[in-house]
Amino acid sequence: MTAIQLIVGLGNPGAEYEQTRHNAGAFFVERIAAAQRVNLVPERKFFGLTGRFTHQGQDVRLLIPTTYMNRSGQAVAALAGFYRIPIESILVAHDELDLPPGVAKLKVGGGHGGHNGLRDIIAQLGNQNTFHRLRLGIGHPGDASKVSGFVLGRAPRAEQEKLDASIDFALGVLPDIFAGEWNRAMKNLHSQKA
């Protein structure tokens, strides 16, 4: 299995979106950066905040696009192209309506499931979807017409605590992910629920 060289955390830029459900992926990358003592700095040519650390001699780059969600692919394609990172070496962390808060799941490939950030990444990578995903459950409002307001809203405290716990679970399986032990990472992560 190809080693992960790029971890992307999806979200929207700006203070008004900072603590919204849609920024769950960005929360995950911020937590990795803090744990690795990496400063995320703006890089205009990559349309995002970037950082780098080394894990067992392998560079791992972090990216939080500063484009709006529906233009996330611009940042991912720019950074992956510049550093020649294979699509299979990318892990994208994002909010997931189809999972309840407190649940996180890993997935390889697949469609966008209506997620505009994933849709744009797939398009910008030449309609290739073989990157890895970390799906962070945020729950569903129950009615499709309420999705936009829901993802752009802040979670109540109890819900946010569950999301934070699922991010902790995901951070706990990063060593397996870096080792290419995807089955073990999935088994361990998928058995956790806040």
From Swiss-Prot:
<feature type="binding site">
    <location>
        <position position="70"/>
    </location>
    <ligand>
        <name>tRNA</name>
    </ligand>
</feature>
<feature type="site" description="Discriminates between blocked and unblocked aminoacyl-tRNA">
    <location>
        <position position="12"/>
    </location>
</feature>
<protein>
    <recommendedName>
        <fullName>Peptidyl-tRNA hydrolase</fullName>
        <ecNumber>3.1.1.29</ecNumber>
    </recommendedName>
</protein>
<dbReference type="Pfam" id="PF01195">
    <property type="entry name" value="Pept_tRNA_hydro"/>
</dbReference>
<keyword id="KW-0963">Cytoplasm</keyword>
<comment type="function">
    <text>Catalyzes the release of premature peptidyl moieties from peptidyl-tRNA molecules trapped in stalled 50S ribosomal subunits, and thus maintains levels of free tRNAs and 50S ribosomes.</text>
</comment>
<dbReference type="GO" id="GO:0072344">
    <property type="term" value="P:rescue of stalled ribosome"/>
</dbReference>
<keyword id="KW-0694">RNA-binding</keyword>
<dbReference type="GO" id="GO:0004045">
    <property type="term" value="F:peptidyl-tRNA hydrolase activity"/>
</dbReference>
<keyword id="KW-0820">tRNA-binding</keyword>
<keyword id="KW-0378">Hydrolase</keyword>
<dbReference type="InterPro" id="IPR036416">
    <property type="entry name" value="Pept_tRNA_hydro_sf"/>
</dbReference>
<comment type="subunit">
    <text>Monomer.</text>
</comment>
<comment type="function">
    <text>Hydrolyzes ribosome-free peptidyl-tRNAs (with 1 or more amino acids incorporated), which drop off the ribosome during protein synthesis, or as a result of ribosome stalling.</text>
</comment>
<feature type="binding site">
    <location>
        <position position="17"/>
    </location>
    <ligand>
        <name>tRNA</name>
    </ligand>
</feature>
<feature type="binding site">
    <location>
        <position position="68"/>
    </location>
    <ligand>
        <name>tRNA</name>
    </ligand>
</feature>
<dbReference type="InterPro" id="IPR018171">
    <property type="entry name" value="Pept_tRNA_hydro_CS"/>
</dbReference>
<feature type="active site" description="Proton acceptor">
    <location>
        <position position="22"/>
    </location>
</feature>
<feature type="site" description="Stabilizes the basic form of H active site to accept a proton">
    <location>
        <position position="95"/>
    </location>
</feature>
<dbReference type="InterPro" id="IPR001328">
    <property type="entry name" value="Pept_tRNA_hydro"/>
</dbReference>
<feature type="binding site">
    <location>
        <position position="116"/>
    </location>
    <ligand>
        <name>tRNA</name>
    </ligand>
</feature>
<comment type="similarity">
    <text>Belongs to the PTH family.</text>
</comment>
<dbReference type="GO" id="GO:0000049">
    <property type="term" value="F:tRNA binding"/>
</dbReference>
<dbReference type="GO" id="GO:0005737">
    <property type="term" value="C:cytoplasm"/>
</dbReference>
<dbReference type="GO" id="GO:0006515">
    <property type="term" value="P:protein quality control for misfolded or incompletely synthesized proteins"/>
</dbReference>
